[in-house]
Design a protein with these regions (language model features):
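Positively charged, low-complexity intrinsically disordered leader regions
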Residues: 1-50
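A short, small-residue-rich loop immediately preceding and capping a beta-strand
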Residues: 29, 37, 48-69, 73-82, ...
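Glycine-rich phosphate/pyrophosphate-binding loop at beta-loop-alpha junctions
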Residues: 65, 73, 106-121, 141-228
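A glycine-rich helix N-cap at a beta->alpha junction
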Residues: 74-113
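Acidic-glycine-rich active-site phosphate/pyrophosphate-binding loop
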Residues: 6-21, 125-133, 149-163, 220
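Glycine/charged-rich beta-loop-alpha catalytic/anionic-binding loops adjacent to active sites
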Residues: 17-28, 48-53, 136-144, 166-174
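Generic hydrophobic/aromatic pocket-lining and core-packing "Φ" positions
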Residues: 38, 42, 66-67, 93, ...
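Buried hydrophobic positions in well-ordered alpha/beta secondary-structure cores of metabolic enzymes
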Residues: 4, 22, 34, 41, ...
């Protein structure tokens, strides 16, 4: 079932000018877009005849979604998570445990997502004969980036249809605004529009930049950080 595409009428009236809409990806099963990627990986795991799946998580949503689909598909599930994130994401950690997943605390480095991804990959490389790995963001080896991107592109596949239903066509001067962290929701939101005329559709990413003129940031693309 497609997630809703709704007009934010009060915000539109308050700000004036632009017609403001929201794609309610939080309607997706489990409350986030991460479910699309998790389902894809669970199906791949079953196709490969493996009984275990591993993944990473930061805010906890990716781990929660993987634990949900692992339970549904009858798979064992390990979720690698930085200890700092475990401390501040208790509700999602509780959900993972209720679904039968094992949370593997990661104490190395910053004790957050980047280190959880690294530890997850290390574990998978040592156990790839019996374990399937799914990465929750657009990071890591190319094939995992492609799988995540294709899965979360369900957002823009739905949105394209909904825009045409609402306006009769893709409207001119359309601005698609999305947060940018690991990139899964941003790519998923933009995927179907990447090749559109840039005078017709503008893709706008909002990312954490940290304190002004500081090295305390996540290497934002706006500061010309390298990709790959």
């Amino acid at each position: 079932k497609p997630t809703r595409f709704i007009k934010l009428q009060n915000l539109t009236d308050h700000l004036g000018g632009a017609q403001i809409y929201a794609k309610m990806v939080s309607d997706a099963n489990g409350g986030a877009h991460k479910i699309y990627n998790a389902i894809t990986h669970a199906m791949l795991c079953k196709r490969a005849k493996k009984k275990y799946i591993c993944t990473d998580t930061g805010a906890g949503y990716n781990g929660k979604m993987f634990s949900m689909v692992a339970k549904k598909f009858g798979l064992g599930c390990k979720v690698f998570m930085g200890t700092r994130d475990i401390e501040r994401q208790k509700p999602n950690c509780d959900a993972m445990k209720k679904n039968g997943a094992e949370i593997v605390p990661v104490n190395s480095g910053s004790k957050t997502l980047v280190d959880a991804v690294s530890e997850c990959i290390r574990y998978w490389v040592s156990n790839c004969d019996k374990v399937h790995m799914g990465i929750g963001s657009l990071v890591g080896p190319n094939i995992f980036v492609k799988i995540c991107g294709w899965s979360t592109a369900q957002i823009s596949r739905e949105l394209k249809v909904q825009l045409e239903e609402e306006f009769g066509e893709i409207p001119n001067k359309l601005k698609l605004i999305n947060c940018v962290g690991g990139g899964s929701s941003a790519y998923g939101f933009w995927s179907e529009f990447i090749d559109c005329n840039k005078n017709k559709v503008e893709l706008i990413g909002v990312e954490a930049g940290g304190p002004s003129n500081s090295k305390l940031h996540a290497a934002p693309l706006s500061k010309n950080s390298k990709i790959g």
